[in-house]
Amino acid sequence: MANVTTDIKRNDTVAVTSGKDKGKQGRVLRVIPDKGRILVEHVGMVKNHVKPNPQKNIKGGIAEQESAIAISNVALVCAKCGPTRVAHKGEGKQKSRVCAKCGSDLTGK
């Protein structure tokens, strides 16, 4: 995938629509548009073996962290009606993201 355009931004709340974490909701930590992937808080958890490093004050062991999932596997969550698609309202710089179901503003999320 190369440079996917998306309406999902950092700190948005999204719901996972497919995969092993289907049904979970979380906050977007990072969007990686050139790979078409997204990091969602507490979704796609993997175990990472960490080597101790006393200089950086890092304790060794097995750490859990989020792994990236495909942007196509998530849907933006509207506060009123739940997971939804995104519509756009306005022109030019006045353009804003709105819920496709109920029309409420999603920009302030």
UniProtKB/Swiss-Prot annotation:
Superkingdom assignment: Bacteria
Region (Disordered), start-end ranges: 1-24
InterPro entries associated with the record: KOW, Rib_uL2_dom2, Ribosomal_uL24, Ribosomal_uL24_KOW, Translation_prot_SH3-like_sf
Any matching Pfam family: KOW
One GO molecular-function entry: structural constituent of ribosome
SMART domains in alphabetical order: KOW
GO biological process annotation, one example: translation
Keyword Coiled coil: no
Keywords: Ribonucleoprotein, Ribosomal protein, RNA-binding, rRNA-binding
GO cellular component, as recorded: ribonucleoprotein complex; ribosome
Functional note: One of two assembly initiator proteins, it binds directly to the 5'-end of the 23S rRNA, where it nucleates assembly of the 50S subunit. One of the proteins that surrounds the polypeptide exit tunnel on the outside of the subunit.
Entry similarity comment: Belongs to the universal ribosomal protein uL24 family.
UniProt subunit comment: Part of the 50S ribosomal subunit.
Name of the molecule in the record: Large ribosomal subunit protein uL24
Lineage per the UniProt record: Bacteria, Pseudomonadati, Acidobacteriota, Terriglobia, Terriglobales
